A protein has these predicted regions:
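N-terminal Rossmann-like NAD(P)+-binding domain of SDR-like oxidoreductases, especially those catalyzing
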Residues: 1-166, 216, 296, 308, ...
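C-terminal substrate-binding subdomain of Rossmann-fold SDR/epimerase-dehydratase oxidoreductases
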Residues: 3, 184-319
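A cross-family signal for key residues in well-ordered alpha-helices
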Residues: 92, 96, 145-148, 181-182, ...
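Hydrophobic alpha-helix immediately C-terminal to the catalytic Tyr-X-X-X-Lys motif of short-chain
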Residues: 142, 146, 150, 180, ...
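Conserved GTPase G-domain signal focused on the G5
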Residues: 170
């Protein structure tokens, strides 16, 4: 939102401000631009069809970025229906709003979790992704399929972005970096799953934003070379595309923790635990398509990204 406002765009933001995590951080995040003359905020739920219809018909956006979702692989195991209502029903309402209002381009957040049971790395958008390991992953794969149907039937240009382990200032408090930082500063042990042998393609928030902006400004187009006898999973003969946005440099969890310890100036007490149900041992993004088509590749190092996060955390929480 800040990037779009800074370049002169008018933005309408939608958030239901639920209590999946502390709403106070959501309000503080919003306070940074709520007073901007080119920003309008709507406190509605994507699952509220009438409210979304009204938002589209009243504000008539030209382009749509849908980053709203019920997030979290682990919570999806406990409460799968929350993911159906938000991520599938809510996304259907976004698609309908786009269809009926002549939207130029819909960009939406998919996830690296769609790679599920795949083990060949780096994960490529040209791989088959039909074996999700969680309801969250299945909901994100569903978004890609729903978008394709709308691109095919209604000619709606859609672009899905598979984000890889996003971190940085103003992130969700249920994410590992947030939990680790809070625990270390409180002299409490951190829970390290898979005995710290996880490898993640940690991607800094500013790099994610840059990827969103670049794809948003280039509406999806049909792949004129698409072959239905050998269908490419990343493109289509309709205006539909998917891309990975990841750092293309997986980091072992123990090294990630070491970078956090350095930034905090404190050592962590570690509680080593087995791999959790629904989790995957490694993520690693192939970003060749992103580089080729948008001349862009995320490049913020984990050390720099964590340092920025710790500076923000200390300032926000006054610790």
């Amino acid at each position: 939102t800040l990037r779009l406002l800074a370049r002169g765009d008018t933005v309408v933001g939608i958030d239901n401000h639920n209590n999946y995590y502390d709403p106070a951080i959501k309000e503080a995040r919003l306070d940074r631009f709520i007073g901007h003359p080119s920003y309008k905020h709507l406190r509605v739920d994507l699952a509220d069809r009438e409210a979304i219809e009204e938002a589209f018909s009243t504000h008539r956006p030209k382009r749509v970025v849908n980053l709203a979702a019920q997030a979290g692989v682990r919570y999806s195991i406990e409460n799968p229906l929350a993911y159906i209502n938000s991520n599938i029903v809510g996304f259907a309402h976004i698609l309908e709003g786009c269809r009926h209002n002549g939207i130029e381009h819909l960009v939406y957040a998919s996830s690296s979790s769609v790679y599920g049971a795949n083990t060949k790395t780096p994960f490529s958008v040209h791989q088959n992704v039909d074996h999700p390991l969680s309801t969250y992953a299945a909901s994100k794969k569903s978004n890609e399929l729903m978008a394709h149907a709308y691109s095919n039937i209604y000619g709606l240009p859609t672009t899905g972005l598979r984000f890889f382990t996003v971190y940085g200032p103003w992130g969700r408090p249920d994410m590992a970096l947030f939990l680790f930082t809070k625990a270390i500063l409180a002299n409490e042990p951190i829970k390290v799953f898979n005995y710290g042998k996880h490898r993640r393609d940690f991607t800094y928030i500013d790099d994610i934003v840059e990827g969103i902006i670049r794809t948003l400004d280039n509406p999806a187009t049909p792949n004129l070379k698409w072959n239905s006898d050998q269908p490419d999973s990343a493109t289509s003969n309709v205006p539909w595309r998917v891309y990975n946005i990841g750092n293309n440099q997986p980091v072992e969890l123990m090294d990630y923790i070491a970078a956090l310890e350095k930034a905090l100036g404190k050592q962590a007490a570690k509680e080593l635990l087995p791999l959790q149900t629904g989790d995957v041992p490694e993520t690693y993004a192939d970003v060749d398509d992103l580089v080729e088509q948008f001349d862009y590749k995320p490049n913020t190092s984990v050390e720099d990204g964590i340092s920025h996060f710790v500076s923000w955390y200390r300032d926000y929480f006054k610790v």
